[in-house]
């Protein structure tokens, strides 16, 4: 049996797209007969990330060496550029073990929005981390093209999926007539563009994050409902008239295809991530700089064509893409 070792700083109980991707792909790999070991922060002593208490990071990460040697994997994938990822990278290079990596987000843009650290600094760190990998997986064509322009090498496309048993359309979908946002409530998600947008329809926000309390006070007319999962989350998608995605820094956005699977059209900006998924007039609308205009057009999009556009995104395909990218240890 082939054994895959995944080293990741993002894992349950964190709630984000990276965790959804890695936990779901791990499950699919095991269903396909692979043995999968996952080294994650829960196996170490951790501390909450400053300004982000929802995320815990490992601090005794030097124990990683023992866990890698105990695993004896046939393939190694390093998922996140955190303490575990950096330590795993060092171990692999020191022992001449080829590995794959993944760029899940626009991390330099996130850091710039939150801490005002220059893009060149964080892009340089990312290139240092990923260009030593045999292959680096990226979510979309547009993001791949941006990364290649910035000097990243050996990039391989890796899509995303949704759980069709949970996310599916309702013939009466959109009946509640509200605008929906699902995701982290944080400045780097550009969520305030949605919160301050003028609309006759009420707004609902699903999720939590470092900016939640301040936005609850600033926008009392918005319904902040907290984290939702599974069928309860899917009901929010199905009942919404439109799913609004204001982010400028996402590389894909699993929430986008979850919304499509529920038949709910998308409104957002014409940037990497949304522009790789949204087809104008078919499953939503994008605008260069006016979110309200995108919402107005998206509200007229047919919910059936929206749902049909989601069918190419399956976790089985995502797992197959992951398998095809793996590089043998020996």
Sequence positions of predicted segments:
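A charged, aromatic-enriched C-terminal amphipathic alpha-helix characteristic of glycosyltransferases
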Residues: 289, 300-328
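Donor nucleotide-sugar binding/catalytic pocket of nucleotide-sugar-dependent glycosyltransferases
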Residues: 124-169
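Short alpha-helical donor nucleotide-sugar binding micro-motif in glycosyltransferases
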Residues: 227-228, 235-240, 322
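Acidic anion/phosphate-binding donor-loop and adjacent secondary structure
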Residues: 162-177, 213-214
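Nucleotide-activated donor-binding/catalytic signature segment of Leloir-type glycosyltransferases, i.e.
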Residues: 213-231
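Aromatic "clamp/platform" in nucleotide-sugar-dependent glycosyltransferases that forms part
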Residues: 248
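Short hydrophobic beta-strand element within catalytic cores of glycosyltransferases
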Residues: 265-268
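Conserved donor-binding/catalytic core segment of Leloir-type glycosyltransferases
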Residues: 171-206
